[in-house]
Every structure is written in structure tokens, then in C-alpha cells.
């Protein structure tokens, strides 16, 4: 089928490139029904959220099941500077090129940004320049309420944990059981549906509460949660460093049930990772129920279903499972869905959005999705976690590179967010670029190992010179890239990524290998960790005493067959953010090991990970305001 001829908008680009919000505000978005119609979606396939957003219903998949999938493209990058190298911008620019200039059916699949960093240091995540998702204020704030649903679900579970411990501390086994299974007016007791899951887990094959022995009553009614083992924390979608460590239960009515806990940012919740990795409503119900919140004092894992909550959480999340349809500046469709952390989770948008998109574009169409952080983290997790659960295979993997980042990897001065760039980054230095290309080469070699064709997108800045750009192209081709293309989509929109679009099309059409995972699932947790560490260039792995204990615990509990999601710095292949280039021969330290059992992965912590960001001295919110005459948002970046 042809391209998005009905909805394509040609941009009038200005030089120098105006602020992102000014570009976004200058373009009148199309009604989302027009974008939907171009994907052959009829009104029964989606729910409108205002004029520019719609939730695409999962039921669409039933109708398009027989359609052949389009091409699947993942966008990763080299090890970034703190300024970012433009993965989101490249993802959007490429899709604008494919849809608006190369007449292809295309859908962009992106993560939903967290509101916290939008007001903090990072700003928004809608792309930039003339490659953006619009309306950008709606994209960056609230969207269709998915993160609010995650916050509500997460905190309901947190409340249930503390309350259950409180009630168990003040009641006998018999009193607990009587309240959990109260008799009806006829004096008859029954188990509600979710209780049958707990009975099955305990190996109690009885359907009548009155048939339970006193021992079975105790086992069923008393979860006996070990407070020191609780891993579930409360969340909110605000950067608030003062909530990182708090104590709860200080009130006079809580009978001294005080414990230390803390808040994470909402997108760090396991429920967000569940949303991203789920394949259907039924699958989401199972994953939410399997989430482990801690252990009993006997060392047994306690789940959301044990607390009686799996069904209620699914009800709170039932609309959040539907991806949100939006558009780019040039009128090509975007599915925004899920935004898990890229360190303690896998940092990719949802499986269901990708599956819907691949059917909607059909054979010869393109679905382009972005993987958070550099390819060592984002693309690795995309392949070994996301593709393992989805069963999908990408034909092409893009590695976004900038001259700026390569100069840093070649030994250039430190790049610090919020500080002016050193002169080395603004003047020609081919030697510095060439030295830094060891980083690019390792990303290409690692990504190629999965079986996809690798295309390097060189995101060009105005200070880059021809000699520097040519050095990057040569290094990319020498390392085994399928192609390496210079792009100017930030300054020119889709027009600036046409060559990239052509290269990606050729790469997809010429893929010859199946997807190869880095490790099988049936080896030990340690063997999987070591396989990933080897891809970083590590000579070995060192485990803390805590990590050893946790690996033993998760293996004993039956979770050793899960994939591994490494939580490490994005600023180096190694655990040390200051080590640039392509370090090797180092020992990777594993400080702790945790599990997102419902989402379906074990995550080792390499170093310290903050799951609740703070605000800088001058947060982005200083610049954000509303034009009260037009109702337009100003200053959002």
C-alpha cells in the first residue's frame, strides 16, 4: 500500500532552527481521526482523547491477524554524552522520511516520557527540531493517563502490603480467616476467585473454607511477610529527592508498625515494565498477579495475588494497555506506549504497540522503535528481553552516532549538561574522532551479532566538518555496518533523513540471518550475567556477598530461567562512567541482584542506581508557562 499521502504535511524550515516548542506550536496538528483513517483504522478501533490523541484498542489485532508484518527497525546509539545523541529525534526523522518522502507506510513506536524529568533537568522527549511528535505538551505531560494508572495501581499494592502486616500483627489465625472468608446470611463461607490462586500455590486442593484443617487455615490466612524483605515502594511522577528514604507507620493508630521505605518515580515501578512486556490483557493479568513484593519469614516469595490484588490491579490498568496514537510534525503516525526505566528495567516501548503497528503497516511497511540508552544496554535488552517475549525479529538495527560523542570517546574534554561545550567539540579534529570510533565499532560488532543488518545514522551538527563525518563513515563500514549515512533531520525534518530511509529499506530487504540471542534461558543466572558482561568487554564478574545471597535465593525460588536486565551506567561500556571509548579487561562488580518477577526478568545492579531523580538548582519548570490568551504552552523543551 502507498504512503501517507492524505496526511503528509511538508514543512517550511527556518534557519537557524527555532526552539522545539515554537516549531511544534507553529504546526496545526491534523485531527487524529485522519491519522487513524490513513492506517485503515475505523472509529470502532479506537477511543478519542480530545482532537489529537486516541487509544488504539487491542481488539484491532484480532481483525488484522492474517496480515503479514511490515519491517521492524530498532534505533540504538553509541555510548552517549550527558547531552544525548539524538536517538528519539533520529527515530522520528527517519519515519518522517519514510512516510512523507519515500511513500512508505510507517509507524513510529516510542516510550511515553515521565513528567518528572520534563520539569527537571532533561526536558521533554518528543524528539527535537523539525523531527518531533506533536502536540509536544500533550506528549510530555499526562498523555492519556497511563502513568497515573500505574501510580494508582502501584500505591494500592503498597498500601495493601503494610495494611496486611498490620492486621496479621493484631489478629489470631482464626480471626484473620473469619474476616478473609466471612460467612454469608445463611452462615455459608466461600473462597472468592483470587483465593483459589493462593490455595493452588499452597497445594491445598479444597473449595470449601470449612474443610480446611487448622494448619491449612494458618498457611492460607497468614502471609507472615518479612518486613526487611519488602522490595515494593510507593511511587509518584515527580522528581522529589526528599522522598527517597522515609518512614511509614508513625501514626498513633498504627500500633508501632514503623518501617523505613521510600518513593520511586512512577516509571520505575514494575507495573510499567509489565505494561511494556505484556502481550495481551490475559497475559497482563497473569504478570500483575505474579509480581513479588518480598518474602515470608520462611523465605517464600509473596505475590500480588497472595495479597488478593491481581484482579484489582488489572482493572486499574485495563485502559492503559491500549497504545496512544499521535502524529509527527509531517503527519506520519506514532504509537506512544509505556516508558520503563532503561537501567532497572528494559527501556523499550511496549510489545503490543509494536505488534499492532507491524500489522497496520503490512508487508513493505516500516515500524521504527527506539531502545533507551546506548546499544550496549537498550538494543541488548530489546533483543534478549523484548524480542524473546514478543517473538518478533528486527531486520535492521540503527546505531545513532555524533561527532561530538566520538570526540569525547577519543579523549576529548568532559561534556557536562548545562555547561558550554569545550572548543575541541566545535573545531575540526579528525584524530580525536578516529580515536573515538573504537566505541562505535564495538556497538556495531555487538549489534551485528544478533543477526540484524546495522545502519549507522550520523546525526550531523552544524560544527561537524566533512573530514570528520567521512572518518565516521569509514570507521562504521570497516567495523561491518551495512551502511553509514549522514542525517540532518533536526534541521530539515524528514527531508534530512531520506538517505537514511533508503539505507534502512535496503538493509531490511537484504537481511539473511535469524535472530540470535546472547544467551539461552536455561543456563544459570551467573552464566547469563557473564555473557552480557563479556559483550561489555569485561574480563570477569565479581559478586558482592549480597548479590551471591540473592542469586541463591532467586534460583531456589525457581526464577533462574528468566532473562537478565543489567542496571548499569549508560555513559560507559564498563561500570565506571569515566571510562570512555571501548574499555576491556575490567572486572564488572555486581553489587546486588533484584527481581521483577511479574514483568519477567532479574536485574543485577552494577553500582548504585537512583530510582527517584532530584531537581537541579534551575529546573526546566522555570521556563514553562501558559499563554493565557491562546491557551498554548510556552517554554517546554
Curated annotation (Swiss-Prot):
Pathway terms, separated by semicolons: One-carbon metabolism; tetrahydrofolate interconversion
Record field: catalytic activity: (6S)-5,6,7,8-tetrahydrofolate + formate + ATP = (6R)-10-formyltetrahydrofolate + ADP + phosphate
The yes or no answer to whether the keyword RNA-binding is present is no
Coiled-coil-forming residues are: none
Q: Which residues bind ATP?
A: 81-88
Record key words, sorted: ATP-binding, Ligase, Nucleotide-binding, One-carbon metabolism
Which Pfam families does this UniProt record tie to the protein?
FTHFS (PF01268)
* Gene3D superfamilies found in the cross-reference section: 1.10.8.770, Formyltetrahydrofolate synthetase, domain 3, P-loop containing nucleotide triphosphate hydrolases
E.C. number, please? 6.3.4.3
Tell me the subunit arrangement: Homodimer.
| Family that this chain belongs to | Belongs to the formate--tetrahydrofolate ligase family.
One GO biological-process annotation of the entry reads: tetrahydrofolate interconversion
Q: Kindly list the organism's lineage.
A: Eukaryota, Viridiplantae, Streptophyta, Embryophyta, Tracheophyta
CDD domains the UniProt entry points to: FTHFS
- The protein in question is named Formate--tetrahydrofolate ligase
UniProt-recorded Gene Ontology molecular function terms: ATP binding; formate-tetrahydrofolate ligase activity
* InterPro entries in the cross-refs: Formate_THF_ligase, Formate_THF_ligase_CS, P-loop_NTPase
Organism whose genome encodes this protein: Spinacia oleracea
The main enzyme category here is ligase
